[in-house]
Amino acid sequence: MSGIFHLKRSGTQYMFNLKSAGNGEVVLTSERYTTKQNAEAGIASVKANAPYDARYQKLTASNGSPYFTLTATNGQVIGTSELYSSTTARDNGITWVKTHAPSAPTADLT
């Protein structure tokens, strides 16, 4: 099960999702960017930072659901996961991103 980045436009802003190519599930969502070029740089940053454990922050939402963020070397969040049902599921999500994000192609849906 590989991954794919979907680059999208919403009004005047751009964003991307990293999805499982197998089931289409969104695994990681970006912040919104003002330019397409910045969103593409965000995808490149996810690919570059995904392999490194230190770039992941394991967090818990206000409703108790575990999730994670992926950060760049400067500490800026470059992607936020879905909410998971357990810490094990969240950790599996991190492993999936580490494995599939670096080589995932981009589908430009703008």
Where are these regions (language model features)?
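Charged, low-complexity amphipathic helices and coil/IDR segments
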Residues: 1-4, 102-103
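A structural feature that tracks compact, well-ordered secondary-structure segments
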Residues: 8, 15-21, 27-33, 42-45, ...
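C2H2-type zinc-finger recognition helix
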Residues: 36, 87
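Alpha-helical recognition helix of canonical C2H2 zinc-finger domains
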Residues: 39, 90
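Glycine-rich beta-strand-turn "strand-cap" elements at beta-sheet edges
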Residues: 98-110
